[in-house]
Amino acid sequence: MSEKSENENKEMREYWKAEEEKIIKQWADKALCYHWMHSRCREIYQKKNTWFTIPVIIISTATGTTNFAQDRFSDDMKDYVVVGIGSLSIIAGIITTISQFLQISELNEGYKTAAISWNKLHTDLKTLIARHPLDRMSPNQAIKLYKEQYEHLFEVSPPITKKVQAMFNSKFKKSANLIKPEICNKLDPTDIFEMSNLERECM
């Protein structure tokens, strides 16, 4: 058999090997972990976004209303009203600037998008590996497809906060069967495909 035919057979192979299923399981578990952590980060930043946004809304509404009604104040009070409106406007501006500097709103949306995307990847991987091997897509196609998705999500997702990492490690420290991401202070040794000398000689 020619080398070209052998390569075509490898690409057309439909059956799954145990090590390929192990790779899919690792990605599925890690995707589930990332979904959980990004969801917790979203909850934290959603609260932060609320605490930064509501005061600005209240101050802006109050200053706008007061500014509109300036003529109703006595001449003695107008100077104080102007100073008060100016001070509140400065405070609102400072709060908005701090929020923008800390990227509260952007991170809030980023964590939301990441949580949804990681959950979708986990669902796809879980569905794939739960099916009968003969009903799945080819292993080479699946690994190429989901490797690209996993790496892309890892690159574009916002960083997990230390607080959420600590929460995750505390909550799931006894989940020995769950394969966790490396960011959770867990380094796994690199696996090598095991073959006997006879199997290597027959390759």
Protein language model regions, located:
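Hydrophobic alpha-helical transmembrane segments
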Residues: 75-88
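Conserved non-transmembrane functional hotspots
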Residues: 2-58, 69, 81, 95-203
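Generic structural motif recognizing short loop/turn segments at the entrances and edges of beta-strands
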Residues: 20, 64, 77-79
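Juxtamembrane "helix exit" motif at the C-terminal ends of alpha-helical transmembrane segments
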Residues: 59-75
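Single-pass alpha-helical transmembrane signal-anchor segments
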Residues: 60-64, 87-98
